[in-house]
């Protein structure tokens, strides 16, 4: 009899066979599931603490997605030859898994939960993110933790006007859509996508298609739980302290209402802090008078937050003005300025209300492309977008340093929005880096980065296919009443039921991200929300187009200029030289950057046009073929008894035989030639070994014949 209580479930999912397995590996974790999708194998584990830490007032969920290089049959690079800090892809996938799981834990559950997913084996054609999300959901489901799942997930492509479920990597490359959707049986919870200017209807259709197709995975997880699940935890939320809620409401309700009449964020924040402090102080007075212990600040803070949420939500649903005085459809005032920084290649300052992004575009060469060492193989990225939000953007102090998960996620969203509207590498050979510095933030800073990024790229002279704008939307739902909010503030983001960000052009959507916190948001509600988002996007695009009609036709004087020439691929080694000696000398002496691709395309870049011209000339000389009948100005390298070695082109010499110097007989070659002397010669013969024979007298004879033909006949 086996020591394992192993349970396996298999199902067909689109074009792939999926296997779920629990009970054999990682048995001391609260839950563990292995997912195998056509040889892409992940191990998802969950551990939940049995009790919350004292004073804990938030849900401490961490999700770590870790790729092991052995899964692709590789040994890690670097001195230590082991995996180091998570890559950007691992961080983004961790966020992707976290987002649909987090809202499914019950309110008041503050026990620490850690989800760890290891990628154990990789089929290069099957991305591991969807198996990882399915595995995390299944591990939580079998663990018995209080979790309102399971969650299913699916990737959807759009090829030849048809949706494709869980496409291979090759299919993703051919698709005009890469969309990931996750949700429960009844509701969509998360959408992440990149698209090539598709309509809202196509995008929503992909979400609905993915949600329908993921049901088979949810059913399989239910079966796995029935046979291999652990007993459900006997966890109950702490009973609500009704007397405390009543007293806090009595003390703070009117002051909170007054605070939310203040339209300025800083003034409102100051007033709210005062209300929180005054309420806590009054409760301590009450407790002191009664001889009891006052409720801790975290508990009081949670009650106050709930009151705030009710105030803001009811005002909006009742048609009253929003926190900053706007109605539900109005976009905040927009100010645009380009060419802000004098010595950068392109820059823009985009301000929308109290959110502001200073965005800078830099142009580089092929050598500046980012090399990504992924499990499926190494590849290069010519477009990079980095998002930074320092603490001063929200008027706070805090840590400044390497980017946090949120910054990496926002940067990727902005990149997704812009990448489909960039010119191809053939049209515009530069590598491009965009950096968005958030200088003020009150909601929707990632979408400000999209708008500012597009404007900075145009300022840098990048011929964008179209203007790209982004807008953040919110949604509040109570029973049958709902309100869609255009261009949400930070406070509205926290207090709403759904926030979603849509970026695109006049023609269609380039990126859509949705995070839904509740069940019950229907396709019809999403349709209304997307239509309102389009209205807001068109308004912003109008502002952007009136400020900047198109890309600058001239690059910045500080940007590198580039020329491209094609050489015979067999000559690449001649340009590079032994140990890189030739190309190193070329770049140092001409002040250029030179990149050579395997197909013989040479890109020369420099801010100095003379240096580029010199580098081009020298490369052409190095790679030129010696042709019979061609005349060259050469340098005598060495004198021999029977002739001279003459250098014609870099690395290409020929023999000028003693009999080919002049017409008369030459007794001593030193009477005619010296080492270092410039001499004009004609190529009279080459052989299959590359040997070249030269003649100087042939040119003398040609000159004599020409002068003779020019002499008029005598009478």
UniProtKB/Swiss-Prot annotation:
GO molecular function: 3'-5'-RNA exonuclease activity; magnesium ion binding; polyribonucleotide nucleotidyltransferase activity; RNA binding
Cofactors (names): Mg(2+)
Coiled-coil regions listed in the entry: none
Catalysed reactions listed for this entry: RNA(n+1) + phosphate = RNA(n) + a ribonucleoside 5'-diphosphate
Listed SUPFAM superfamilies: Eukaryotic type KH-domain (KH-domain type I), Nucleic acid-binding proteins, Ribonuclease PH domain 2-like, Ribosomal protein S5 domain 2-like
Keywords on record: Cytoplasm, Magnesium, Metal-binding, Nucleotidyltransferase, RNA-binding, Transferase
NCBIfam families, alphabetized: polynuc_phos (TIGR03591), PRK11824.1 (NF008805)
Name of protein: Polyribonucleotide nucleotidyltransferase
Gene source species: Burkholderia lata (strain ATCC 17760 / DSM 23089 / LMG 22485 / NCIMB 9086 / R18194 / 383)
């Amino acid at each position: 009899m086996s020591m394992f209580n192993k349970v396996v479930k298999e199902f067909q999912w689109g074009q792939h066979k999926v296997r779920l397995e629990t009970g054999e590996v990682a048995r001391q974790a609260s839950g563990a599931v292995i997912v195998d999708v056509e040889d892409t194998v992940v191990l998802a584990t969950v551990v939940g603490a049995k009790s919350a830490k004292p004073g804990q007032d938030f849900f401490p969920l961490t999700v770590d997605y870790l790729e092991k290089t052995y899964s692709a049959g590789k040994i890690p690079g670097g001195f230590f030859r082991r995996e180091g800090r998570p890559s950007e892809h691992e961080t983004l996938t961790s966020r992707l898994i976290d987002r649909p799981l987090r809202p499914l834990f019950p309110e008041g559950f503050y026990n620490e939960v850690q989800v760890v997913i290891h990628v154990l084996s990789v089929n290069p054609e099957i991305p591991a993110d969807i198996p990882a999300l399915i595995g995390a959901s299944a591990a939580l489901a079998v663990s018995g933790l209080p979790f309102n799942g399971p969650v299913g997930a699916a990737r959807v492509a759009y090829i030849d006007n048809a949706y494709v479920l869980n496409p291979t990597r090759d299919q993703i490359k051919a698709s005009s859509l890469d969309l990931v959707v996750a949700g429960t049986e009844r509701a969509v919870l998360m959408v992440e996508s990149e698209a090539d200017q598709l309509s809202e209807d196509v995008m929503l259709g992909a979400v609905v298609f993915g949600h329908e197709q993921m049901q088979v995975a949810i059913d399989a997880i239910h079966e796995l739980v029935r046979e291999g699940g652990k007993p459900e935890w006997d966890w109950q939320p702490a009973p609500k302290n009704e007397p405390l809620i009543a007293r806090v409401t009595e003390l703070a309700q009117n002051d909170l209402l007054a605070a939310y009449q203040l339209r300025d964020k800083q003034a409102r924040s100051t007033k709210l802090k005062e209300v929180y402090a005054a309420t806590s102080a009054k409760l301590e007075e009450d407790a002191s008078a009664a001889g009891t212990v006052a409720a801790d600040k975290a508990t009081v803070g949670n009650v106050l937050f709930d009151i705030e949420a009710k105030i803001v939500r009811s005002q909006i649903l009742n048609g009253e003005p929003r926190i900053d005085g706007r109605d539900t459809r109005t976009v905040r005032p927009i100010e645009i300025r380009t060419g802000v920084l004098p010595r950068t290649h392109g820059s823009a300052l985009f301000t929308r209300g109290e959110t502001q992004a200073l965005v800078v575009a830099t142009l580089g060469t092929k050598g500046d492309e980012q090399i990504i060492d992924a499990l499926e193989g190494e590849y290069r990225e010519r477009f990079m977008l980095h998002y930074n939000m320092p603490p001063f953007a929200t008027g706070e102090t805090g840590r400044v340093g390497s980017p946090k998960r949120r910054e990496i996620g926002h940067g990727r969203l902005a990149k997704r929005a812009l990448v489909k509207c960039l010119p191809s590498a053939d049209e515009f050979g530069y590598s491009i880096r965009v950096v968005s510095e958030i200088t003020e933030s009150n909601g929707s800073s990632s979408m400000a980065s999209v708008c500012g990024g597009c404007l900075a790229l145009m300022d840098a002279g990048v011929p964008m296919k179209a203007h790209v704008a982004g807008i953040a939307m919110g949604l509040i739902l109570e029973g049958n009443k709902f309100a869609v909010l255009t261009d949400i503030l930070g406070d509205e983001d926290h207090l709403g039921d759904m926030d979603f960000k849509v970026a695109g052009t006049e023609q269609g959507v380039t990126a859509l991200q949705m995070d839904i916190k509740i069940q019950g948001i229907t396709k019809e509600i999403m349709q209304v929300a997307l239509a309102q988002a389009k209205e807001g996007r068109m308004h912003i695009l109008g502002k952007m187009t009136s400020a900047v009609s198109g890309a600058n036709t001239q690059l910045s004087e500080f940007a590198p200029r580039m020329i491209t020439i094609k050489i015979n691929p067999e000559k690449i080694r001649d340009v590079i030289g032994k140990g890189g000696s030739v190309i190193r000398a070329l770049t140092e002496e001409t002040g250029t950057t030179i990149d050579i691709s395997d197909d013989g395309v040479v890109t020369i870049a420099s801010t100095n046009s003379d240096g580029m011209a010199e580098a081009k000339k020298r490369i052409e000389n190095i790679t030129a073929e010696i042709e019979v009948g061609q005349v060259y100005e050469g340098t005598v390298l060495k004198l021999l008894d029977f002739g001279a070695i003459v250098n014609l082109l870099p690395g290409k010499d020929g023999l000028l035989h003693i009999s080919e110097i002049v017409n008369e007989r030459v007794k001593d070659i030193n009477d005619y030639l010296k080492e270092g002397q410039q001499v004009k010669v004609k190529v009279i013969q080459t052989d299959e070994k590359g040997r070249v024979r030269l003649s100087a007298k042939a040119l003398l004879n040609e000159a004599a014949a020409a002068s003779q033909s020019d002499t008029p006949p005598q009478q």
